[in-house]
C-alpha cells in the first residue's frame, strides 16, 4: 500500500502486518483483499495504469520482501464464508500443518471445485437452457445464469457446499 492509504492509530498497515507475521507459524489471508488485493488492487482509473492505492495481496507483499515469507493460506471471499475460516484454523490446530492448497494457495477442501460443478442449475446448463433476463420465464424456472454473467465455471468457492446464513442460501439459489 502507498503511504497514507492504510493506517490504524497512526501505524502503517505494512508495519502492523509485519508485527503480526513476525511470530506467526503460518499466515492466513482472510478475504478477497488480503488474498488477492480485491477491488482496490483491480481498480485502475486509466488503461495501463496501476491502482492509485498501491493495494497488494499478502502474497504480493511476501514476494516483494515487504513482509516476512511464511506458509500462506488464502481464504478469499467478500465476505469469506465463516465455516471456511474456522475449518482452516481447526485443520491447522488438529494437524499442525496447513491443509492441501491449490495453485492460488487456497485450501483444496473448500476451493477445489468450481461453483459450476455443484450448482443446482448445472443440469439446465447441460440441457442448454439459460435465463436471458433476471425476470424471464427461464429465470423463474431456475435455468442456468451463464448468459447473464455467471462466472461459476471459473469461480472456485465453497458456497455451493456450505452456503451462507447457516446453510440457508447463496447467490445461485436466490437467482444471482
Please place each PLM-identified region on the residue numbering.
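Iron-sulfur-associated redox domains of electron-transfer enzymes in respiratory
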Residues: 1-163, 169-171
Amino acid at each position: 500500500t502507498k503511504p497514507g492509504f492504510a493506517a490504524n492509530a497512526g501505524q502503517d498497515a505494512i508495519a502492523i502486518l509485519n508485527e503480526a507475521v513476525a511470530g506467526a507459524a503460518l499466515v492466513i489471508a482472510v478475504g478477497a483483499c488480503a488474498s488477492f488485493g480485491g477491488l482496490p488492487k483491480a481498480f485502475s482509473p486509466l488503461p495501463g495504469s496501476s491502482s492509485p492505492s498501491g493495494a497488494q495481496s499478502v502474497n504480493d507483499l511476501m514476494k516483494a520482501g515487504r513482509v516476512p515469507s511464511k506458509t500462506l493460506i488464502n481464504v478469499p471471499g467478500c465476505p469469506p464464508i465463516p465455516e471456511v475460516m474456522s475449518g482452516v484454523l481447526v485443520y491447522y490446530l488438529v494437524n499442525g500443518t496447513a491443509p492441501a492448497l491449490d495453485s492460488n494457495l487456497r485450501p483444496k477442501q473448500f476451493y477445489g471445485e468450481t461453483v459450476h460443478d455443484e450448482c443446482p442449475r448445472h443440469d439446465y446448463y447441460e440441457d442448454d437452457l439459460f435465463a436471458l433476463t433476471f425476470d424471464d420465464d427461464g429465470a423463474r424456472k431456475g435455468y442456468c445464469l451463464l448468459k447473464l454473467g455467471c462466472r461459476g465455471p471459473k469461480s472456485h468457492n465453497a458456497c455451493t457446499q456450505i452456503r451462507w446464513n447457516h446453510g440457508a442460501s447463496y447467490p445461485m439459489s436466490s437467482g444471482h
